[in-house]
Amino acid sequence: MRTLWIVAVCLIGVEGNLFQFAEMIVKMTGKEAVHSYAIYGCYCGWGGQGKPQDATDRCCFVHDCCYGTVNDCNPKMATYSYSFENGDIVCGDNNLCLKTVCECDRAAAICLGQNVNTYDKNYENYAISHCTEESEQC
């Protein structure tokens, strides 16, 4: 299932939220988003289960929780307005649903940037079958 996220990002091209989120990640972490975060830990990528493995994975867990609060639009496909100003991400949509999705992505990208030093190559391409501990609540 998580491999579908990679395919979706590639197929979306310059359209859609996943591309926008990937662009935010690159800006905030300096890492290539798909290679570094599409299949990382228990939560970075499509879906998620178990306990986040480190602070980087926790950013993705919180992002999943944030997407869970979104109503009235598909957070993985919604296209929103945003810009980069003075090293920060600024969400600029008037539509509440799109602004919420943008803010979820913004917070996750900032979190990943703040925790880039916790990134552990051992969690790249991490098998979801290792994510067996009980998940915490959002």
From Swiss-Prot:
Catalytic residue positions: 63, 105
UniProt record, GO biological process: arachidonate secretion; lipid catabolic process; negative regulation of T cell proliferation; phospholipid metabolic process
Tissue-specificity statement: Expressed by the venom gland.
GO (cellular component) term, any one: extracellular region
Main location: secreted
Pfam families the record matches: Phospholip_A2_1
Residues noted as binding Ca(2+) in the record, renumbered to the chain: 43, 45, 47, 64
GO MF: calcium ion binding; calcium-dependent phospholipase A2 activity; phospholipid binding; toxin activity
InterPro entries: PLipase_A2 (IPR001211), PLipase_A2_Asp_AS (IPR033112), PLipase_A2_dom (IPR016090), PLipase_A2_dom_sf (IPR036444), PLipase_A2_His_AS (IPR033113)
Enzyme class: hydrolase
Extent of the signal sequence: 1-16
Keywords for this protein: Calcium, Disulfide bond, Hydrolase, Lipid degradation, Lipid metabolism, Metal-binding, Secreted, Signal, Toxin
Subcellular localization, as worded in the UniProt entry: Secreted
EC identifiers of the protein: 3.1.1.4
CDD domains (UniProt xref): PLA2c
Cystine pairings recorded for this chain: 42-131, 44-60, 59-111, 65-138, 66-104, 73-97, 91-102
Matching PANTHER family: PHOSPHOLIPASE A2 FAMILY MEMBER, PHOSPHOLIPASE A2, MEMBRANE ASSOCIATED
Primary role: Snake venom phospholipase A2 (PLA2) that exhibits high hydrolytic activities and shows strong preference for the anionic micelles (dPPC with deoxycholate) to the zwitterionic micelles (dPPC with Triton X-100). PLA2 catalyzes the calcium-dependent hydrolysis of the 2-acyl groups in 3-sn-phosphoglycerides.
The family this protein is said to belong to: Belongs to the phospholipase A2 family. Group II subfamily. D49 sub-subfamily.
Protein's UniProt name: Acidic phospholipase A2 Drk-a1
Organism, scientific name: Daboia russelii (Russel's viper)
